[in-house]
Amino acid sequence: MIRVFCKNTGTFKEFQEGTMLLEMIDEFDFEKPYPIIAALVNNVPQGLKFRVFNNRDIEFIDYCSYFGRNVYCRSLCFLLYKATLDIFPDCKVMMRRPISKGFYCSVEKGDGTELSDKDIDLIKQRMSEIVAEAIPFHRHEVPIGEAIEVFRKLGHMDKVKLLETCGEVYISYYTLGGTADYYYDVLVPDAGYLKVWDLTPYRGGAFLRVPNRHHPEDLAPFFEQPKTFEVFAESIRWNKIMGLDNVGDVNRACLDGKATDLIQIAEALQEKKIVQIAEEIDRRYRSGNNARIVLITGPTSSGKSTFCKRLSVQLMACGLHPISFSTDDYFVNRVDTPKLPDGSYDFDNFDTVDHDALQKDVMKLISGKTVEVPEYNFVTGIREYNGKKLKLEEGSILLIEGLHALNPKLLDNIPDAGKFKIFINTITSISLDDHNCIPTSDNRLLRRIVRDFNKGAFSAQETISNWPNVRRAEVKWIYPYQEDADVLFNSAYLVEFAVLRSHAERILATVPKNCPEYSEAHKLIKFLHYFIPVSDKQIPPTSLMRYFIG
């Protein structure tokens, strides 16, 4: 017999060795508002068909949990792939990226045509049939060479290249109704669990809608993100030009000694974009509308500060005189900072910034007056005036950088014609393979973990623990204004994960296995193992990446 502790109930129960998680659920009495779809076993995600042979701590999870959503969405992607292949056996399905609270998918049919509305209806019908039949997902753990041959015979060279370079001995792949595919984490037991979804035509492909995070009986709301989509599409075009569709391609290039070339190309592309932005700011300023306020924002760890410095250099090359400050210097004194329900400070709240004082100072600056601007003392938590004075001369451009820079309330007395808005995000365009895209939030979390640790600010455990609060604040305060920007800048780096691996792995290894944060640390370590590590010696000192890795 084995002894299992259920975190959902805080109780122990005994089971026969080898009992499946699926068989344990009803033995524990706890409220289950939504179906249980997976579990954390000793803080490691496992599918419900996982058999337990030793004493373990178990937490059953549904769609409302972070890991539960990942399991559900991953399974939905396989369902879509299976149904599409059943209708169009010679097609190529590519799950491009999460967008608009769903997934954008492109399909290359054998005859070279795009999906029609009728095609999508046929795929939807087949998906519904598979769900109604509750066809099971079967997991197969095999030597990696065997898995490589499975996918080589299927012509899935994206998976072959990934598996050949990941360095594992054994891996698991899944089958659904005889169709094989690879996913880098667990799935639901069968397709019958996937009751809430929709598939609609979108930009020559299909959009896979998923359940609402808080009310999984309903679909998440859809909203257009045309500017974000175009930035992603531009990155995909460049990846194709370089022949780098997936991580396996990047790994091969690094093994062939081309890592330095990839770094230089990534730097050149970012610098080219910054030059274009500077030239557009210059054009607007000199066109007569006197647009001299540049607002720069983006989520945490997107690279705002370094971008601001590099943009300043290019503005000077245009003959302009950039003057910059951060909204952080206008933070209210710490005693006046808004608080979260648990009593901790809500540093990401819009009212953390004294926007009235900031707006008054900006109005004075653009009217030609000299203004003494504050400097926030993060040690004492007090806004200080230390004699720093600013004045806008002829040709001066004011750069304002911060989390809330694009919030329309920040400078609501200044017409939009006088502002140039820039939103920086980390839009990861590279995928593990055709069916496993990489969440942009993972990109930024890894940056944040490395930066916090190197600066001695927080441990990996502390950074991971606070990340849900950061994400909630971004959704509330930052992302609503993304599409309002005049330009979106993508700070994602083609070989970023390969460079971050050597920094992040050792830091993530410090997270104790017995804490809740280990689940995320384990996931990130497993994810980083797909990348061939690349030295950071060729990363230039002015790179956006350098700020995070030191």
Where do the protein language model's features map onto the residues?
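Conserved nucleotide-sensing/catalytic segment adjacent to the nucleotide-binding pocket
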Residues: 332, 336-379
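Conserved NTP phosphate-binding and transfer environment spanning the P-loop NTPase/kinase superfamily
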Residues: 285, 408, 412-550
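Hydrophobic anchor at the beta1->P-loop junction of P-loop NTPases
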Residues: 294-296
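Conserved lysine of the Walker
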Residues: 304
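Hydrophobic positions on the alpha1 helix immediately C-terminal to the Walker A/P-loop
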Residues: 307, 311
